[in-house]
Every structure is written in C-alpha cells, then in structure tokens.
C-alpha cells in the first residue's frame, strides 16, 4: 500500500518482528516508508499506521507533537472515522 502524505508518496511495508526490533510501527522519514510489524493483530496494525502517519504530519507541518499527543490524537481520529462511516463520503 502507498499513502500520499504532504505531497510525498510513502510506501507502507509490513515487516517481521526481527526487522521491527521491538517496535510496532516506524515512520522512516528519509526513506518515505512506514514500517508496521506483521506479527500484530489487524486492529493493532491499523492503530500503528494512523500513529505513524500522524508523526509524519507533525514533522511535515512542524507541529512538534509529543508521543502522548500523537497517541491520543490517533485514537480520537480512528474513533471519529469508525463512529461516522458516512464521513468519508462528504
């Protein structure tokens, strides 16, 4: 899968736990890649993808969000989208 974020194409890659070295997800800014651990549940992978995307947005727009802010906003946005399926049609 590929995501276009702030004009850049990011490749989403699912990696082994060895490659992830204890991380669930990684935003690789210099490579335009998002790595997600392939050993996690689909729900955890989805959360990780949103989380890493928010890190990229924070960096691109100089928002300077800390880890806690990224975490809370990740869950808030997922809830918004899942609780309002018609939102994507607007």
Give the positions of each predicted feature.
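Metalloprotease/metallohydrolase-associated module, dominated by Zn2+-dependent proteases
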Residues: 1-44, 60-90
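Active-site recognition of the HExxH zinc-binding catalytic motif
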Residues: 47-59
